[in-house]
């Protein structure tokens, strides 16, 4: 992997940390909603993610925000969002920072 590729991945993670579920004061990355980010050599990115619940009322907003933020990263040519509920999200997927913010630690 070259430095430019690694920089793109870091920039994507940085942008994902600016996406919030409107009902929870923690970003989607630290909530554990992002399962995988695949950056292709061609600049196309696939984000595999979930939501806290299948019937999340903010689903469309969150998914579109993820897409727009990732597309804004230098070097990204396009973004595909794969929404999955396998495995089902649970609070153990959160980062330590998220658990502290939400009072679980």
Swiss-Prot record:
Pfam families hit by this protein: FeS_assembly_P (PF01883)
Deleted gene: phenotype: Increased sensitivity to hydrogen peroxide. Increased incidence of spontaneous mutation in presence of hydrogen peroxide. Slight reduction in growth rate. No reduction in the ability to accumulate haem on cell surface. No change in Rgp and Kgp proteolytic activity.
Gene3D superfamilies membership: Fe-S cluster assembly (FSCA)
Protein's UniProt keywords contain RNA-binding: no
InterPro entries according to UniProt: Fe-S_Maturation_MIP18 (IPR052339), FSCA_dom_sf (IPR034904), MIP18-like (IPR002744)
Keywords, sorted A to Z: Disulfide bond, Iron, Iron-sulfur, Metal-binding
Induction: Induced by oxidative stress due to hydrogen peroxide.
Record has Nucleotide-binding as a keyword: no
GO MF, one annotated term: metal ion binding
Its biological purpose: Iron binding protein that protects DNA from Fenton chemistry-mediated damage caused by hydrogen peroxide induced oxidative stress. May be involved in iron-sulfur cluster assembly.
Further remarks about this protein from its record: The grpE-dnaJ-PG1777-PG1778-PG1779 genes are co-transcribed and may form an operon.
Subunit structure: Putative homodimer; may be disulfide-linked.
PANTHER family cross-referenced by the UniProt entry: FE-S PROTEIN MATURATION AUXILIARY FACTOR YITW
Family as reported in the entry's similarity comment: Belongs to the Fe-S cluster assembly domain superfamily. MIP18-like family.
Protein name per its UniProtKB record: Fe-S protein maturation auxiliary factor PG_1777
